[in-house]
């Protein structure tokens, strides 16, 4: 620390007279072994530390220096340029302008790229684990590009050194907008200023003096009592970002989140149309649907997620309704159908539940034995807690938001049974002829018994066609389903018709023989309903009659 202080002050840095860097006694210090402590009370609005622009490590300086080796560094990725520059500066030793600063920097880190196999056991199945693998791949590619640009790279310019340099930037960098007001933001290093530890919500002012001092300044915003540590505030960062970038976590981080990525099937119906709606209305890309579940469940955030999922899961009929609505309104004012609401909530629950289940199943059954494992466990445990809290919240939200639909019935399942096409219709007197035929083949018309046969889909197609044959007598209207989907024969529908013809139509002519409805066109129609409109709820398939 003495070398850094001497070098920093020589290069124009300023340090409040009551600030002293002392050896930390905290075994779990977020950064190195020194902390800044107030030797006397420090009033608000006092300059704590400053770093001149000239002493900062910036992209412009790195680029100009590396262009001496190869002019092609002019157009090189700024991250590669910065990491290569710092790595090469570290090899200069005492000849470097930043020798004292580089000597002070940690020689190793607690970020996931420094984890060994035992450490990684605490990260398995987390987003940070896969993010670390991706980062390693990117940095390998960057290192290879740096080697190709260097005319005569020394053997000491290793990939490990590049990782070290890149981690210095991820753990200590500031934005270049502090120095260059009107340029595109790139990372910069501010020696001495970056020595303060992070504390969420810490009032601190970052000031840039472009006139007199030409320096970046950290200014106190509240009294710092004698003996207290001075902190910086990196902003509202969750534990995943802290672990990946800085190598530590906060046990009760108010800004912690879980990143939830929704995978879209490549054969999603109406994919292009849905992508356009999401991009135009919500600025979401269908190919990269990423949501952040907060530590404290937030209704507004979940509503935004559900709006997006209502588009993703929309049936053909719902998509037409949504498209018409968007001619005069926006997605926020759109009220999905009951099917759309349930489907969105079910999909969200499925994703959250599967993430939580994955983390719980891969949870190490041993206690952490290293600092890295401690941070990883804090991160992992917090992810599990957020997911479990989100599951509870979504279930309660689902109950509250749908309750007005099914009241005065006791629950949603009963409402669906009474207002949907499902195998529960086999208990209705109107379906007695069909029930006898199904019971002859399957030995039962009990809903749970039929689900257990794994032939619920084929039975649903049959029930849909039967509903068409008695549509005027049904306890609910299926007119929107009839109007919304054309009864046109298609190859898949013809194939299903042949199966039903052999299983039912030919064997039970007393039920199906006299009706004109049991044909290839209507089976194709029913297949569309099952593929596009069906909803799985409590293990049963329902096709809700739209209203």
Curated annotation (Swiss-Prot):
Q: Which residues form the signal peptide?
A: none
Annotated localization: Cytoplasm; Nucleus
Q: Top EC class per UniProt? A: transferase
Instruction: Kindly state one GO CC term assigned in the UniProt record.
Output: cytosol
Residue stretches making up the SET domain: 17-235
Q: Which GO terms describe its molecular function?
A: protein-lysine N-methyltransferase activity
| Xref: PROSITE patterns | SET
Report if keyword Cytoplasm is assigned: yes
EC number, UniProt record: 2.1.1.-
Keyword Cytoplasm assigned: yes
Q: Cite the binding residues for S-adenosyl-L-methionine.
A: 234
Query: A GO biological process this protein is involved in?
Result: ribosome biogenesis
Q: Which UniProt keywords apply?
A: Cytoplasm, Methyltransferase, Nucleus, S-adenosyl-L-methionine, Transferase
- Protein family according to the UniProt entry: Belongs to the class V-like SAM-binding methyltransferase superfamily. RKM1 family.
Which PANTHER family does the record match to this protein? PROTEIN-LYSINE N-METHYLTRANSFERASE EFM1-RELATED, UNCHARACTERIZED PUTATIVE METHYLTRANSFERASE
What the protein does?
A: S-adenosyl-L-methionine-dependent protein-lysine N-methyltransferase that methylates ribosomal protein L23 (rpl23a and rpl23b).
Q: What is this protein called?
A: Ribosomal lysine N-methyltransferase set10
Naturally occurring in which organism (per UniProt): Schizosaccharomyces pombe (strain 972 / ATCC 24843) (Fission yeast)
């Amino acid at each position: 620390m003495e070398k850094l202080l001497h070098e920093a002050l020589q290069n124009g840095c300023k340090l409040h007279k009551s600030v002293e860097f002392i050896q930390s006694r905290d075994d779990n210090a977020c950064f190195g072994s020194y902390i800044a402590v107030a030797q006397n009370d420090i009033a608000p609005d006092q300059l704590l530390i400053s770093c001149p622009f000239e002493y900062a490590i910036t992209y412009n300086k790195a680029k100009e220096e590396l262009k001496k080796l190869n002019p092609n560094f002019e157009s090189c990725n700024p991250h590669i340029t910065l990491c290569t520059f710092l790595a090469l500066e570290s090899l200069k030793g005492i000849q470097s302008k930043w020798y004292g600063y580089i000597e002070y920097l940690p020689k190793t880190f607690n970020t996931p790229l420094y984890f060994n196999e035992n450490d990684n056991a605490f990260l398995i199945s987390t987003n940070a684990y896969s993010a670390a693998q991706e980062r390693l791949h990117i940095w390998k590619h960057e290192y290879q590009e740096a080697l190709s640009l260097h005319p005569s790279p020394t053997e000491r310019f290793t990939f490990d050194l590049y990782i070290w340099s890149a981690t210095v930037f991820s753990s200590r960098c500031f934005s270049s907008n502090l120095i260059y007001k009107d340029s595109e933001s790139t990372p910069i290093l501010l020696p001495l200023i970056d020595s303060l530890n992070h504390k969420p919500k810490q009032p601190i002012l970052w000031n840039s003096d472009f006139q007199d001092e030409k320096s970046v300044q950290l200014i106190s915003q509240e009294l710092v009592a004698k003996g207290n540590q001075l902190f910086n505030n990196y902003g509202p960062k969750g534990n995943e970002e802290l672990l990946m970038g800085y190598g530590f976590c906060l046990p009760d981080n108010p800004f912690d989140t879980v990143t939830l990525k929704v995978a879209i099937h490549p054969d999603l119906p109406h994919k292009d149309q849905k992508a356009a709606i999401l991009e135009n209305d919500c600025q979401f890309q269908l190919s990269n649907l990423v949501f952040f579940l907060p530590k404290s469940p937030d209704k507004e955030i979940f509503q935004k997620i559900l709006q997006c999922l209502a588009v993703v899961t929309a049936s053909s009929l719902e998509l037409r309704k949504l498209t018409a609505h968007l001619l005069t309104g926006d997605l926020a004012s759109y009220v999905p159908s009951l099917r759309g609401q349930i489907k969105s909530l079910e999909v969200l629950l499925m994703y959250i539940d599967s993430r939580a289940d994955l983390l719980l199943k891969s949870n190490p059954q041993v206690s952490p034995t290293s600092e890295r494992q401690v941070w990883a466990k804090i991160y992992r445990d917090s992810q599990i807690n957020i997911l479990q809290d989100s599951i509870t919240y979504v279930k309660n939200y689902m109950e509250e938001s749908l309750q007005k639909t099914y009241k005065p019935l006791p629950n949603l399942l009963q409402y669906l049974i009474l207002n949907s096409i499902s195998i529960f219709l086999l208990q209705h007197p109107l379906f007695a002829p069909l029930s006898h035929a199904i019971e002859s083949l399957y030995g039962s018309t009990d809903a749970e018994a039929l689900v257990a046969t794994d032939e619920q889909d084929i039975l649903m197609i049959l029930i849909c066609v039967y509903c068409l044959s008695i549509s005027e007598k049904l306890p609910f209207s299926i007119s929107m389903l009839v109007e919304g989907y054309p009864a046109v024969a298609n190859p898949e529908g013809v194939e299903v018709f042949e199966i039903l013809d052999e299983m039912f139509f030919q064997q039970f002519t007393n039920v199906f023989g006299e009706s004109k409805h049991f044909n290839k066109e209507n089976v194709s129609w029913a297949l569309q309903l099952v593929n596009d409109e069906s909803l799985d709820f409590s293990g049963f398939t329902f096709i809700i009659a739209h209203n």
